[in-house]
Amino acid sequence: MTNHNSILEVNLKNLQYNYKKLSGLANRSICAATIKSDAYGLGVLDVFDALYKVSCRHFFVATTQEALEIRKKRSTANIYVLNGLESNNISIFNKHEIIPILNDIKECNFVLKNIAKIGRAHV
């Protein structure tokens, strides 16, 4: 059996260049970065720092736990949780200024009834 070992190297300067280029093309829109699952295994905090340095302020993660990890590092970024209202403690979104993505009508209705506890949400 053949053993296939792969190595992925990411140049953070190139990542920054690509973000600036894409952000420039979207001049009237918000350009965001999806850094879920440890930035796809690249190291979420390293990738976050690199993109934040070039003015990326909107980040998508999969889980509330990932959002909290980033929030500890930087208080001014907009952090969106793709898994929606997964947390049993919905006040965590408001307390840490994390924005859940609402994935279905059930979550939308829940937020309408509990917006004071949640803060903001993205549909």
Predicted features along the sequence, with ranges:
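Active-site-proximal beta-alpha core segment in soluble small-molecule metabolic enzymes
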Residues: 2, 6-10, 14-17, 29-120
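Conserved PLP-enzyme active-site core in the AAT-like
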Residues: 25
